[in-house]
Design a protein with these regions (language model features):
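Transmembrane-helix signature of polytopic, membrane-embedded enzymes
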Residues: 95-118, 152, 278-282
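Short acidic/glycine- and proline-prone juxtamembrane loop motifs at membrane-interface regions
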Residues: 126-133, 300
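Loop-to-helix entry region of an early transmembrane alpha helix in multi-pass inner-membrane enzymes
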Residues: 56, 60, 64, 72-93, ...
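Short hydrophobic/aromatic helix or loop-helix immediately within or flanking a transmembrane segment
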Residues: 31-74, 234-239
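Membrane-lumen/periplasm interface segments of specific transmembrane helices
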Residues: 1-18, 32, 171-180, 184, ...
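Signature aromatic-anchored transmembrane alpha helix within multi-pass, membrane-resident enzymes
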Residues: 198-201, 320-349
């Protein structure tokens, strides 16, 4: 509903010529399939071969699922949006199951799910993006690893690795949880633990192997990802942060706005390490590190949402009562604002 309100507001602004960016006309017209959603929809409909090579950086799981849903009569483009929305509901449900399993109070669980669903970048969960699918898989991996159900982790890890370029990061909590019992485990369980830790890499490798066979360069998805006009090359976080701040004085205010969020997220990662099992903090830290070591910080907030333990940490920090209600209300307002800016082509989701 909030995303629909944002889209309607953006459409009104466009129709009344309050916005002069020509890109706004396209993003409003494409709606939930704007920005990267257009790539996922095009891949689902026409395949990688019909797109420029830059399309290879979008891993295949979401387009494949969208195409499968499209066979039900809605078409692959609508199928991609349906997949994202269903996955968002699955992710929220699994988060409830996971946090209850961790023994958190019911009020904290409820607060965490609301903050997760209404986080400022959470509007992308209903876009035709891979975020919702990956988050559902990542939370499922955590649930499987924390309960030592390695067969489940293997299956979900394979899919997570095929869902996005950094999907293999879900191996981090798997390794940490496996090490807790590895020495005492029987040989068969050790083999399952090793397979579970390797599964996200195998999922990614299967796609890369296909790319190598089809296009002659298995690493092409990562090579195009590091182009200067996309994520850019790897750099140290201090340099990327300094460049973002410097951009504020050259008219790139949107880039500088990532910096306050970076500070908040780092603080919440500290909370993760202090108040949650080690696997949560490690996963969040490595996910954020991969985001801030890119020369281009665009979409930082979206990548931060993938580090879902930071949302759990926020739910632990915010107290019940007026603090909780205020945090949820402010988050919902921020999400609506960011979604509006994305539809107006003023913010890169």
């Amino acid at each position: 509903m909030l995303v629909a309100i944002a889209w309607f507001g953006a459409r009104v602004a466009r129709d009344h010529h309050w916005v002069h960016d020509p890109g706004a006309r396209a993003t409003v017209r494409h709606g939930l399939l704007s920005w990267d959603g257009a790539f996922y929809a095009d891949i689902a409909q026409r395949g990688y071969g019909a797109l420029p090579r830059v399309g290879l950086r979008f891993f295949p799981l979401t387009p494949l699922l969208g195409r499968a849903v499209g066979w039900l009569g809605v078409g692959p483009r609508t199928g991609v949006v349906i997949v994202a929305n269903v996955a968002a509901l699955v992710a929220a449900t699994l988060l409830v199951v996971l946090l209850r399993r961790e023994g958190l109070p019911a009020a904290t669980v409820t607060r965490a799910v609301w903050l997760f669903s209404l986080a400022p970048p959470a509007f992308v969960l209903v876009f035709g993006y891979a975020e919702a699918t990956f988050l559902a898989l990542a939370i499922g991996v955590f649930l499987g690893a924390r309960t030592q159900r390695w067969g489940l982790v293997i299956a979900l890890g394979l899919l997570a690795g095929a869902s996005r370029p950094s999907g293999f990061i879900v191996a981090v909590p798997v390794v940490i949880e496996a090490l807790r019992t590895f020495r005492a485990a029987p040989h068969r369980e050790r083999a399952a633990q090793l397979a579970a830790a390797a599964s996200p890499f195998v999922g990614a490798a299967l796609y890369l192997a296909w790319v190598g066979h089809r296009f002659g360069d298995a690493l092409l998805p990562y090579r195009v990802q590091t182009r200067a006009n996309l994520k850019g090359s790897f750099t140290d976080p201090i340099t990327s942060t300094t460049d973002a701040l410097r951009g504020m004085f050259h008219g790139h205010i949107g880039t500088a706005l990532h910096v306050p969020w970076m500070i908040v997220v780092v603080a919440l990662i500290v909370v993760c390490f202090r108040r949650l099992p080690a696997s949560y903090g490690a996963y969040a830290a490595i996910t954020i590190a991969s985001a801030v070591t890119s020369a281009n910080l665009d979409s930082f907030e979206r990548y931060a949402l993938s580090a879902f333990p930071v949302v759990i940490a926020l739910a632990l920090v915010v107290r019940a009562g007026w603090q909780s209600r205020a945090a949820i209300a402010l988050s919902a307002a921020a999400m609506t604002g960011y979604a509006t800016l994305a539809f107006l082509h003023a913010y890169v989701p």
